[in-house]
């Protein structure tokens, strides 16, 4: 099971939110989310039985399949449209652009901890196409219009944007 290899003090991403394991008892482990985490993410709205994406920290000696994801959620977004596209689905999201976060077409974004490629982008939104395999192995297939998701923007893009702002 997932918990067999866990150790106290390790990080586990829960829908993209990095949380530290503080206790383990058999197949159950415990994490702590502080007020800041609950305010910036959708974790506070989860109910018992909700399915979340779980991912352990990456080892630095393995291949990077996706983009660099830290588990530091920047903000939430709302799903505004879902369109079937030959077995895949295109999800559209809007977010508050006043935070200064940006996405670019063919760039990377993390939605609920899933590394995805941006199909198109606007000032306050973007869309991603999700293949059947990813839909089957994540909780993205459960999204509906109006669902709130956690976003982590590309860390390299965030640093570049900050450097440009400071000039």
What is the meaning of each model-derived region?
Residues 1-167:
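Conserved loop->alpha-helix
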